[in-house]
Regions:
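Acidic/His- and Gly-rich active-site-bordering loop/insert found
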Residues: 1-64, 73-77, 81-89
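Histidine/acidic-residue-rich, glycine-tolerant segments that coordinate divalent metal ions
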Residues: 16, 56-63, 69-70, 82-180
Length: 180
């Protein structure tokens, strides 16, 4: 890869937002598609369809597993579909192609940039394993394959069972309890 381009992307600056403003006023609706590759070794057996058809990752241990290539395809397909009906549309549509979903950094960076500040409705999706048939769509409002990371500090105070046990503050117990 071009070293200058890689440097510009350092820190997760690889997100893309397509904004489609229509002539009639209306709500701002956003659709989010994650697009990061994962640290996964792709199969290299002769019967592996991506290898067989020439679209396997060129980089070892970097592949768009977890459906992320499908998410990008869905996003681009939605953009094409919307553009075909642009005369009938109102408001604004934002197509958010988010990097770093797996490491929980991409959404935070895009939110910090103000990309979703004006959004009235937000839709996100993830190719997954809830559907029972290949031609099915499962809609949920919960956190399917969602994650959040946070840092927490627990401070305690040591004591002795025979000398003022009531002064003890068990940080380890608090930390363990917060995990369950």
């Amino acid at each position: 890869a071009d070293a200058d381009l890689v440097e510009k992307m350092r820190g997760g600056k690889t997100g893309v937002v397509g904004v489609m403003k229509f002539s009639r006023p209306g709500k701002i609706v956003a659709f989010r598609f994650d697009m990061d590759c994962n640290d996964v070794e792709e199969c290299d057996t002769a019967d592996h369809r991506p290898l067989e058809n020439g679209f396997q990752s060129l980089h070892a241990k970097e592949m768009h597993a977890c459906g992320h290539d499908g998410h990008v395809t869905i996003g681009l397909g939605l953009a094409k579909l919307i553009s075909e009906y642009k005369e009938e549309m109102a408001g604004t549509i934002k197509l958010i192609f988010q990097p770093a979903e797996e490491g929980v950094r991409g959404a935070r960076a895009m939110v910090a940039k103000g990309i979703v500040d004006d959004v009235d409705y937000m839709f996100g999706g993830h190719i997954g394993f809830k559907a029972t048939k290949s031609d099915s769509l499962v809609c949920l409002t919960g956190g399917f394959l969602a994650t959040t990371k946070l840092d927490a500090s627990f401070k305690g105070e040591s004591s002795h069972a025979g000398a003022a046990p009531e002064r003890g503050r068990n940080a380890l117990l608090a930390a363990a309890a917060s995990c369950i």
